């Protein structure tokens, strides 16, 4: 594109002017029944949407690349672009083509971005769609999150990359705003949907003024006084949201300052490893939320996911949730409530569209049905004190029910522009216009019949043509007898044509009745949205309460269906006691019965060292413990015979790793980073899961690191810890440090094949069954046979008994223990001969350690 607009046609000059204002967005330029894209936008859209790329003449001497999409199908294409992280500026024709002397006037009426969409067709029904902003100042990150469709506005501050990663993992923003002067750690800087904005948009003073103006307050103290960096992020976010919506945001009436002291903290690795809302391969099925979610409304499903990602520490809130779930289970009240919830739509997002004045007719019919269902919904709830406040928030809206019921027909068309939305009887003027438009023929017959009776003129006819409109025609013979109120309009050879005041009034109405009816209907619809919006705050409050009830009813239903129990929440005791616990997800996908297991950790037993074969169930046992603790901190029932759970401040997991290729980190580096985060941040109130620390390096390095990490957790941090390992040397820790005990997953061997019993028993495992697991994995039998030979050979070498401390003892070796330097030219000695028979790639950690003792004996 050339900067010299004079070389372009007037229409293309108009387009280029609009495009210059939206350089980072695809411009949908309305031309008749199509949205057209030009130049680079056309090429990009053709590639992303798989539509035809053509040319439209020339501009500035070069062919213009062009692609188009039908106006009526635009929503489908917008949805695809938004999912790809693209933003679209929609330029509509706002002028009358009949009156335009040059190009029809156009302007951008809305900007559709991944984080600011509110149209039903562009949103995932059961997933939050968040616009977020992050502002970095000296490693202090101000963070803001806005659910535009629901009007939910949150701010917080986190410190350091780990906390930021955890927060973004929880929020999972559809669109993320950052200052052009700052990047973000990890994958967030370059992911689709991340926008770099001018640094001045994050100015704290300007942001504070904008927020105060939005909320109509003098200062932000009433919202908990967010930190300066959080204010900067919130101001940038609010400004961007207003820019994209081309107007005010009346449903954004306040913000919530989120405190991490109120929640059980989980880092990004923990959220992934526990598979709360997504599995490790990105699926929603077979997650904790998948098991918990039997909600009836979309807004309830979204709230449930937020609860899962933010378990609470507030004992009052948790106890109330438990009481409500217990009350709903009495007499199966939850079933009655869920039957009514079936009739309630997505009030939260409908009200967001009402506030943005983008609600469609069917939104209003769904809102009407939802509000109509509130009284019977309240009637299903138990007469318990724990529901009083919730019932008050749900409320009842008889005036809105009556208004919407009389204003909109039961099954309206999709769009107001199609007409036929406003119900008969709502507006006399509209009813009259519709009657004229729909019954013009009958009205003309009625006028003709009445005029004939009045005048007694037999040749009288009421007719119409495009030139003269409606008229009364009389023969030349009878024209002299026309009444005095007949005004002559046209004289013909054999007839005279007249107009009367009544016919003139009908003509004025009939010729424009259809267009007038549609214009009036649009005005009535806009006024109707204003009337609904007058109760917006109370309606939003009701929607939030209904969503909360939906989640509680879902948790009650799940507890009954899955045989879960309410855990005892303990304030004055550090304890995790689970009797016959089950993994909530694995239990649902197993064909066989799940083997339950118990756990008891308290001040006297802070750590359990878990050993046993691969695939024996160590990771499942650890994860089920974390998930049961998390469920308790939701206020939910848990999969166990009984449970007592003390208050936790954090849940950490170090389970499994893979290379971080994008970040240039090896498996071992990822493992050590996660371990470092745990050792630096865990407290005595934390639950820590450590699985196979030290696998990614040499045997002695790994064993030493695992030993030291376990020792630090037990001796210094005193966290509740489940520590799974294949280093059998760690089973000696209980003999050296208090508060540690051993447990193992049982297995048996039959016909050289391993049978996993999945039962946890106290004490260390007797062996690792490495060859049997390899056989199950399909390792060739020849390799298994050779490994068995080597194993027997190593076992017969009678290694020295392992020492009571890890191989890499902190004590420096004595000079006498230093090995002599070997000559390069000596004949092979016994050690060298023994080494030639060893293949380190085929040894388990235990076998490698035993081989080392054998070599030591040969010195």
UniProtKB/Swiss-Prot annotation:
* CDD domains referenced in this protein's UniProt entry, alphabetically: ABC_MutS1
Q: Which residues form the signal peptide?
A: none
Give yes or no: UniProt keyword Nucleus. no
Q: Name one GO cellular component term.
A: cytosol
- Single Gene Ontology BP annotation: mismatch repair
What keywords are annotated for this sequence in UniProt?
ATP-binding, DNA damage, DNA repair, DNA-binding, Nucleotide-binding
The segment annotated Disordered runs over: 797-822
Record-listed ATP binding positions: 612-619
- Output one GO MF annotation: ATP binding
Q: Which HAMAP family match?
A: MutS (MF_00096)
Q: What does this protein do?
A: This protein is involved in the repair of mismatches in DNA. It is possible that it carries out the mismatch recognition step. This protein has a weak ATPase activity.
- State the similarity comment: Belongs to the DNA mismatch repair MutS family.
Q: What is this protein called?
A: DNA mismatch repair protein MutS
Q: What is the lineage of its organism?
A: Bacteria, Pseudomonadati, Pseudomonadota, Gammaproteobacteria, Oceanospirillales
């Amino acid at each position: 594109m050339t900067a010299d607009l004079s070389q372009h046609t007037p229409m293309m000059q108009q387009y280029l002017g609009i495009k210059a204002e939206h350089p980072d967005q695809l411009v949908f330029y309305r031309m008749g029944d199509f949205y057209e894209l030009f130049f680079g936008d056309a090429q990009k859209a053709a590639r992303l949407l798989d539509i035809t790329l053509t040319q439209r003449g020339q501009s500035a001497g070069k062919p213009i690349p062009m692609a188009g999409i039908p106006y009526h199908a635009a929503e489908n294409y917008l949805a695809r672009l938004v999912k790809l992280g693209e933003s679209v500026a929609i330029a509509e024709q706002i002028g009358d083509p009949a009156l335009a002397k040059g190009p029809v006037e156009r302007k951008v009426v809305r900007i559709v971005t991944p984080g600011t969409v509110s149209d039903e067709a562009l949103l995932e029904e059961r997933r939050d769609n968040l616009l977020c902003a992050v502002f970095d100042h000296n490693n202090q990150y101000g963070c803001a999150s806005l659910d535009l469709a629901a009007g939910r506005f949150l701010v917080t501050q986190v410190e350091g990359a780990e906390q930021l990663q955890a927060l973004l993992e929880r929020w999972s923003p559809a669109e993320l705003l950052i200052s052009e002067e700052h990047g973000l750690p990890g994958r967030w800087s370059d992911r689709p949907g991340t926008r770099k904005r001018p640094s001045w948009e994050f100015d704290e003073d300007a942001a504070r003024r904008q927020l105060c103006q939005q909320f109509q307050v003098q200062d932000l103290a009433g919202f908990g006084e967010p930190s300066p960096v959080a204010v900067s992020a919130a101001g940038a976010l609010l400004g961007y949201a207003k820019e994209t919506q081309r107007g005010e945001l009346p449903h954004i009436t306040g913000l919530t300052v989120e405190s991490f002291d109120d929640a059980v903290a989980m880092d990004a690795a923990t959220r992934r490893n526990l598979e709360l809302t997504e599995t490790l391969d990105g699926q929603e099925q077979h997650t904790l939320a998948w098991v918990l979610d039997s909600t009836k409304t979309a807004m309830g499903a979204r709230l449930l996911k937020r609860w899962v990602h933010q378990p609470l520490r507030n004992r009052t809130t948790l106890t109330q949730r438990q009481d409500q779930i217990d009350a709903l289970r009495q007499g199966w009240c939850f079933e009655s409530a869920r039957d009514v919830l079936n009739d309630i739509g997505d009030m939260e997002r409908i009200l967001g569209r009402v506030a943005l004045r983008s609600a469609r007719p069917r939104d209003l019919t769904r809102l009407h049905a939802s509000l109509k269902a509130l009284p019977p919904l309240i009637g299903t709830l138990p007469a318990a004190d724990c529901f009083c406040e919730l019932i008050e928030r749900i409320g009842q809206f008889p005036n809105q029910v009556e208004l919407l019921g009389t204003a909109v027909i039961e099954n309206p068309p999709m769009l107001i522009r199609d007409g036929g939305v406003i119900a008969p009887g709502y507006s006399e003027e509209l009813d009259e216009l519709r009657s004229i438009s729909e019954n013009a023929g009958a009205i003309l017959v009625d006028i003709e019949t009445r005029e004939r009776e009045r005048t007694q003129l037999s040749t009288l006819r009421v007719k119409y043509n495009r030139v003269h409109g409606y008229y009364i025609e009389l023969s030349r013979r009878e024209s002299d007898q026309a009444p005095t109120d007949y005004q002559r309009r046209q004289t013909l050879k054999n007839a005279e044509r007249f107009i009367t005041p009544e016919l003139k009034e009908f003509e004025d109405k009939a010729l424009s009745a259809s267009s007038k009816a549609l214009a009036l209907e649009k005005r009535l619809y806009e006024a109707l949205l204003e009337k609904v919006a007058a109760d917006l705050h109370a309606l939003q409050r009701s929607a939030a309460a209904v969503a909360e009830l939906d989640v509680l009813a879902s948790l009650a239903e799940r507890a009954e269906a899955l045989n879960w129990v309410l855990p005892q929440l303990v304030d004055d005791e550090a304890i995790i006691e689970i009797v016959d616990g089950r993994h909530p997800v694995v239990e649902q996908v197993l064909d066989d019965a799940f083997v339950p297991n118990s756990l008891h950790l308290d001040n006297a037993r802070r750590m359990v060292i878990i050993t046993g074969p691969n695939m024996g169930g160590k990771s499942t046992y650890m994860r089920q413990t974390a998930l049961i603790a998390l469920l308790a901190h939701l206020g939910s029932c848990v999969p166990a015979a009984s449970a007592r759970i003390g208050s936790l401040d954090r849940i950490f997991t170090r389970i499994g790793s893979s290379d971080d290729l994008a970040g240039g980190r090896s498996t071992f580096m990822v493992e050590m980073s996660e371990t470092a985060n745990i050792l630096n941040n865990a407290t005595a109130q934390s639950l820590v899961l450590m699985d196979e620390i030290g696998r990614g390096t040499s045997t002695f390095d790994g064993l030493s690191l695992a030993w030291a990490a376990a020792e630090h957790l037990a001796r210094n941090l005193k966290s509740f810890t489940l520590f799974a390992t294949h280093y059998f040397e760690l089973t000696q820790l209980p003999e050296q440090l208090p508060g540690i005990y051993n447990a193992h997953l049982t297995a048996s061997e039959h016909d050289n094949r391993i049978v996993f019993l999945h039962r946890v028993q106290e004490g260390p495992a007797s062996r690792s069954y490495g060859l049997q697991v390899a056989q199950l994995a399909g390792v060739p039998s020849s390799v298994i046979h050779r490994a068995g030979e080597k194993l027997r050979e190593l076992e017969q070498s009678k290694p020295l008994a392992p020492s009571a401390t890890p191989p890499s003892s902190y004590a420096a070796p004595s000079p006498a223990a230093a090995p002599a330097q070997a000559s390069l030219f000596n004949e092979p000695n016994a050690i060298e001969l023994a080494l030639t028979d060893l293949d380190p790639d085929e040894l388990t950690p235990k076998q490698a350690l035993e081989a080392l003792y054998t070599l030591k004996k040969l010195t």
